[in-house]
Amino acid sequence: MTNYAIILAAGKGTRMKSDLPKVLHKVAGISMLEHVFRSVSAIDPEKTVTVVGHKAELVEQVLAGQTDFVRQTEQLGTGHAVMMAEPVLENLTGQTLVIAGDTPLITGESLKNLIDFHINHKNVATILTAEADNPFGYGRIVRNQHDEVLKIVEQKDASDFEQQIKEINTGTYVFDNARLFEALKNINTNNAQGEYYITDVIGIFRENGEKVGAYTLKDFDESLGVNDRVALATAESVMRRRINQQHMVNGVSFVNPHATYIGVDVEIAPEVQVEANVTLKGQTKIGAETILTNGTYIVDSVIGERTVITNSMIEESSVADGVTVGPYAHIRPGSSLAKDVHVGNFVEVKGSSIGENTKAGHLTYIGNSEVGANVNFGAGTITVNYDGQKKYKTIIGDNVFVGSNSTIIAPVELGDNSLVGAGSTITKDVPADAIALGRGRQINKEDYAKRLPHHPQNK
């Protein structure tokens, strides 16, 4: 049978106290809405309709081209939100999943199980439920002696007996598509909130003697709806635990998984060692047998095998096999480090390519440069790439030796096998195999220091 999905993403999220629409707040690096959409994709819906409202344009940008959008200009409840999808889904045959966009922990596996349960039991509606240790505040699932769902009763309306029920409504449902939109025509706003409730549809089905079922989640965490920053932090914690556990199952070692942040799209090969306080974000990929030490931060970068990154930052760059970086190095966007490069402490690389086996051990800036293989940068080397208006490129060939405290002012090229003397300021090209000395000649004035007031003999 054909599946459809409706994602409810129109709410403002007042309790978040944010200008950002609630569903766009991030968990593990992507928005809650994206988490929900990815999970919904597991049921392979023929059509997905996302209901937007508050700051609709921002929400639509996140899933542009991936879903149909309809707008709920007035926030008149969950039932009203689902009504907005009628022009897209009416008269279609199949079952429709209705899910809130602020439930980032729900998994695709659970949604597939929900759909299968709905079909196998020939229900007109199926409620996704969970068993809560503390059900206070949730709608309760009331069943009869045959374990059939009778109704959903809200906390404020529940009797003393009903308040003892642990099974709660998660706010996710599957409906026979045609019957859903027929029933929506019969709900009203005769309630304390003056809104159209999707739960009223369940009551209509029961009154008609139609079959309503409930599928219970195995993991209560999946039911979490995020309405404030406290719940957002809870979702982040649960998602981080899931992600790290999966990496450990796949052969990655964590010194302290509770103090490690790995984004949902990060890929890590087996035999990688991750120490505490490491952050990996975006589309980062880490190769096998790499070591990431305490405090390392990597975003949208590809790291090769057998590399060692020590307490350093790497952004939007590529690092090949056998490279060592840090401590306290910064590899900025647009950089690439070839095999066996060493970038040491307090070295910054920006928008540059560095060839195999090149070494910049300490206190060096390499910007907008193309550096060959087997180059050695002495301590304090600076490529000067900016004149206040434009940035210029430095080209350094293979097997070049740059002495300490040298300043290389771009645009300039150092030829293969050339050598720059320590303390030089280079403003012109250096031919291959040449030695460049760009510093003032040293002059020694004998006994001149004795004339100075601080000399020992003058005290």
Swiss-Prot record:
Top-level class of the enzyme under EC nomenclature: transferase
> Where is this gene product found?
Cytoplasm
The record's listing under CDD domains reads: GT2_GlmU_N_bac, LbH_GlmU_C
- Which domain of life, per UniProt? Bacteria
Q: Where does UDP-N-acetyl-alpha-D-glucosamine bind?
A: 8-11, 22, 72, 77-78, 139, 154, 169, 227, 332, 350, 365, 376
Its annotated pathway? Nucleotide-sugar biosynthesis; UDP-N-acetyl-alpha-D-glucosamine biosynthesis; N-acetyl-alpha-D-glucosamine 1-phosphate from alpha-D-glucosamine 6-phosphate (route II): step 2/2; Nucleotide-sugar biosynthesis; UDP-N-acetyl-alpha-D-glucosamine biosynthesis; UDP-N-acetyl-alpha-D-glucosamine from N-acetyl-alpha-D-glucosamine 1-phosphate: step 1/1; Bacterial outer membrane biogenesis; LPS lipid A biosynthesis
* Stretches for region Linker: 230-250
Q: Where is this region: N-acetyltransferase?
A: 251-459
Amino acids binding Mg(2+): 102, 227
Q: Give the GO cellular component terms, alphabetically.
A: cytoplasm; membrane
Active-site residues from the entry = 362
Per UniProt, acetyl-CoA binds at: 379, 385-386, 404, 422, 439
Protein function: Catalyzes the last two sequential reactions in the de novo biosynthetic pathway for UDP-N-acetylglucosamine (UDP-GlcNAc). The C-terminal domain catalyzes the transfer of acetyl group from acetyl coenzyme A to glucosamine-1-phosphate (GlcN-1-P) to produce N-acetylglucosamine-1-phosphate (GlcNAc-1-P), which is converted into UDP-GlcNAc by the transfer of uridine 5-monophosphate (from uridine 5-triphosphate), a reaction catalyzed by the N-terminal domain.
What family does the Swiss-Prot or TrEMBL record give for this protein? In the N-terminal section; belongs to the N-acetylglucosamine-1-phosphate uridyltransferase family. In the C-terminal section; belongs to the transferase hexapeptide repeat family.
The protein, known as:
Bifunctional protein GlmU
Originating species: Streptococcus sanguinis (strain SK36)
